[in-house]
Amino acid sequence: LLTGNGLTSLPPSLAVAEQEASVTSLTTKRYILRFPALETLMLDDNKLSNPNCFVSLAGLKRLKKLSLDQNRIFRIPYLQQVQLRDGSGDWVGGRGSPRKQPQSMLQSKSWIYEASDDQPDYTILPMKKDVDRTEVVFSSYPGFSTSETTKVCALPPIFAILPVALFPSLCELIFHNNPLVAHTRGVPPLLKSFLQERVGIHLIRRKIVKAKHHILMPRKDSRKVKTQVPKVPKQPMILPHPSVMIKSPSKEMLESEAELTTEPPPTKTISVEREMPIEGLGGPPMPHRTFVPLPPICSDSTVHSEETSPRSDAAGRLSADQLSDEDTKSTESIFLTQVSGLSSSIFQRDDSEIKEKEQRPPSTAPREAKRTQKKPPSASFPRKYHGYEELLTAKPDRPCSTCVKHPLVYRSSKPRLDTLQKHYVPKEKRTRRIPVPPRRKTRAQLLDDILIRMRDTQNITEAPLGAVLRQRTEQRLVNQKQFLEAKKLLKEFRARYRRLVRCSLRSVFGTTAPPQARPALSGSQPKLGRFLEFMDEFYQEPTASDLKG
């Protein structure tokens, strides 16, 4: 295993080594195989590019699997087969059977695949056009002849794998991720028919990728959306409070009002109070009204403002239509805030108070003016919000308030909505105690256990005889071997009992023929086992001397 070592070349004496001169004579040379039993060689993920590396591998006669992936190999040379003598005197041949020759000199022989009828099935011809490109000369290696040029087949680059057939016992070749097969796909039919089907070399030119298991995501029923949630409007629907429309007159109008207010009629304040809610809610719709802004608030002088409506019958009041353009331009605007959250009970109370005041005699104007400032207008809802009056009169719902105070936070897929849920509190993680590993046995103890197991190889199964014999037919089929052993044991007990009875009768009556033995006890009787155990313990079979006497 030489994976990922960054090797650029292999030593020439990797597989075959020459003996020393002291051992051999000067006239003869002998070579020894270094790895005669090597069958698998992994040279993947290296930088092998020189064809000389195949010269180093040519002496491995039992090489079956060769891995050359992720290297820089662009061709494999054709090597002349040379017969070598190993230490035992055998000649190293090719895929054919090795043979011996009396000569000790190296004899080169061209490689030709011969069939059974001694005629060449195929031959390898050299390329005549470009000899320098295909010629490979190995001058320093003693085991291969360099007298003849290397023969290369005039085929596309993928056919440079054909010289692999010269390896005697090669069965599998892995050569992907090399320049040799970088620009081609698949195995050509010629290589497949020759190398795989004839010679028996399995070619692997693609990296084997293990199939990944398909990831299945479980579908949970709780995650399915079965109902459509209605769209929430951007602006919530809120019942608006009746807006107050106020006008600010000019200086001339203020002076005229001052003259009129010196002698106010007693019924004027009542009409203003009754007209205020009508103007706010019962009057014309919002887009048709004329809004008049308020003047700036001054601390020195007080500004009197009044509200007018087209329905008012009070004389001496100026309406918004009578204002001139100059007066409206001279005024400044002030924004009023909307009061929300008022219950309808307040509005109903104001309506009842207004009715009582209408029935009562009118009082002084300043007191009534102070009261009007404190009382809000009555509630009269427009048609747009018809049907929502109960929202203002409804009492607070206790279940709703508890749901708001206790939000539902679940960690389970099926929560119980009929009960109050507790807040999720994460549990503290507790570290588990690591179990103490058993004490490791020494080598002597392990060896003793192995010897004990080898010595005692019997497997003993204890079972009551009566329970095994009383089993049903279904259980007998399951434990058929156990039932047969119990039946055989019962047969032996019966034979031993008969033998005991015969021996006892012979000892009593002498040579007289014993009477016919009674049938043995059935195996279903529970006392049979105890009786046989008692007889085996206290009775010994009679010897030959006892029988003679």
From Swiss-Prot:
Record's keyword terms, sorted: Coiled coil, Cytoplasm, Leucine-rich repeat, Nucleus, Repeat
Q: Where is the composition biased (Low complexity)?
A: 227-236
Which SUPFAM superfamilies does this entry report, sorted A to Z? L domain-like (SSF52058)
Return the LRR repeat spans. 37-58, 62-83
Q: Name one GO biological process term.
A: response to X-ray
Q: Which GO terms describe its cellular component?
A: cytoplasm; nucleus
Instruction: Locate the region Disordered.
Output: 221-242, 277-329, 347-384
Skewed-composition ranges (Basic and acidic residues): 348-360
Q: Which InterPro entries match?
A: Leu-rich_rpt (IPR001611), LRR_dom_sf (IPR032675)
Q: Extract the coiled-coil ranges from the record.
A: 480-500
* Localization of this protein: Cytoplasm; Nucleus
Q: What does this protein do?
A: May be involved in the response of cells to X-ray radiation.
Q: What is this protein called?
A: X-ray radiation resistance-associated protein 1
This protein's species is Bos taurus (Bovine)
